[in-house]
């Protein structure tokens, strides 16, 4: 009976073999400590970015006490409904908690009916007085915090390098290691197509990378909610661009892995291609006056730029004494998304074809 059941068993189909390879590759990352190492790197960087500014005297939030308000005279702006236009004191903080504001006139607490707070002016955060302020000194006590935009930007700036690290750890040697370590002699003769093997490996690499990037963005979001009481409205869009950049970089890493003959060369080339070589080309464009919209590393800038409101535009900086003109190019979000997707698709197709044709030698 058992022998009949044994003969009745069917081999998994090509599609069913993909998740099997996927699972074993993920287990390999766990055994080799690569996934854990990537998470540790991300955690250390998050800790440093979060701790260093407050430790050096730049906290994310706080409370200012008895801060002198420099009140403008009647020649200032005219506010509808106020009998004394222009009597306004500026609070020089990014975001002020309106409910926490206390205003003092010559050391005496003013009633909230004698002033109003507004953050919707070209001056920023101001206290508008409903009476003549001539001859008086005004101070204010209030809670404040930084903007969610600036907080998120400080963290997302590292996401680019973290993605390259993930591609280096999980993709650079994914293919070439089977040839260098001669494990291909054990794997390739099995009844599994190269395409299934490739897709399983690539899926595992992307899963590991997504776990690391998701952890990075997730912790950043929590810290933002705790530290500045909010999350930038484009934060999730930045996360989406980060995942697309991960897809493009991972695909290129796999292409390099199919072309190289050794794991060391593939790892080094993958890392420096995205950290040094392509960024140098992008910088040359800023000096020469051509916009490297085709560059995947240039397009990656959209991850942090999308957090800026309004979205930045191209500009030119003139240095007349040096006779130098610097073009400050900014990647367009739509173009960047298409460029990264194109790199991913082309690299995956080419690397898969090369992998199917590559044979064991030696």
Where are these regions (language model features)?
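Short hydrophobic, aromatic-rich alpha-helical segments embedded in or entering the lipid bilayer
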Residues: 289-322
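Secretory targeting signals
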Residues: 9-12, 39-42, 46-64, 143-174, ...
């Amino acid at each position: 009976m058992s022998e009949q059941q044994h003969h009745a068993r069917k081999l998994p189909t090509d599609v069913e073999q993909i998740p099997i390879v996927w699972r074993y590759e993920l287990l390999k990352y766990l055994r080799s400590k690569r996934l854990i190492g990537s998470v540790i790197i991300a955690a250390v960087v998050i800790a440093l970015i979060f701790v260093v500014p407050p430790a050096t005297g730049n906290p994310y939030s706080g409370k200012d006490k008895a801060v002198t308000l420099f009140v403008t005279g009647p020649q200032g702006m005219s506010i509808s409904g106020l009998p004394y236009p222009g009597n306004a004191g500026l609070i020089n903080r990014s975001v002020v908690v309106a409910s926490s504001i206390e205003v003092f006139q010559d050391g005496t607490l003013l009633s909230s009916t004698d002033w109003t707070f507004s953050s919707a002016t070209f001056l920023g955060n101001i206290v508008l007085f409903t009476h003549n302020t001539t001859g008086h000194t005004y101070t204010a006590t209030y809670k404040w915090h930084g903007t969610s935009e600036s907080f998120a930007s400080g963290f997302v700036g590292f996401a680019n390098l973290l993605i390259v690290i993930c591609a280096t750890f999980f993709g650079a040697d994914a293919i070439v290691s089977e040839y260098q370590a001669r494990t291909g002699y054990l794997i390739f003769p099995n009844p599994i197509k190269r395409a299934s093997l490739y897709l399983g490996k690539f899926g595992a690499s992307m899963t590991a990378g997504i776990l690391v990037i998701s952890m990075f963005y997730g912790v950043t979001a929590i810290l933002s909610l705790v530290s500045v009481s909010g999350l930038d409205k484009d934060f999730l869009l930045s996360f989406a661009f980060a995942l697309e950049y991960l897809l493009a970089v991972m695909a290129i890493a796999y292409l390099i892995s199919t072309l190289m003959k050794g794991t060391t060369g593939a790892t080094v080339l993958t890392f420096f291609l995205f950290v040094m070589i392509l960024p140098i080309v992008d910088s040359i464009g800023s000096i020469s006056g051509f916009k490297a919209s085709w560059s995947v590393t240039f397009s990656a800038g959209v991850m942090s730029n999308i957090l800026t409101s309004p979205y930045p535009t191209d500009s030119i900086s003139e240095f007349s004494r040096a006779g130098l003109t610097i073009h400050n190019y900014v990647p367009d979000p739509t173009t960047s998304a298409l460029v990264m997707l194109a790199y991913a698709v082309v690299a995956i197709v080419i690397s898969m074809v090369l992998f199917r044709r590559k044979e064991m030698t030696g």
